[in-house]
Amino acid sequence: KRQGRILSALNETLRRGGKYKNGAIVLHLDASHPDVDEFITTPREALPWVKRCVNVTPEWWEDMDVITRQKLIKGIKAGDIWLNKVKYEGTKRIRGNVCLEVYLPSRGTCLLQHVNLGACQFEDIPRAFSEGMSQLCALHADTGVGKTGEYLSPAEDRQVGLGVLGLANLLRRYGVTYEQFG
């Protein structure tokens, strides 16, 4: 709990004083860890600047006592806890990025970017995706990642993710309902 509070305070400081004023820290704890109950039930105000995630396997889920499982489900419903299925690449465990969208080898990195569909004309969407992905791939090599040895080099690990936002705005602009879209 103490380490979580330190990381929460650090993230608050970086978010408020940093150049980009953003950042995210996700604390992960395996469901098999003896402190999982305390991790799940720590009040949001005790860790306001971090997200919490419980890593599970089918075995750990089955081994978890019913009361702790209920607390975990309650925390997920409240938006205080994320759930992450443990993944492996061969025999090596791989970890999710902050948003649990991309799974990485140890010391791996990824760059994420989005296309704002709400700012696009319909016919521009394919070009926006192509240009966005090209920018991400070019940027990865320019970040300096890998030069210190702290992270894998871009030649060994070049993971990028291109997502979308603004779908509701795009649909509204073109008069398409969710029912029609789905």
Model-flagged regions — what are they?
Residues G4-A9, R16-R93, V164-G182:
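Conserved, charged catalytic cores of large soluble enzymes
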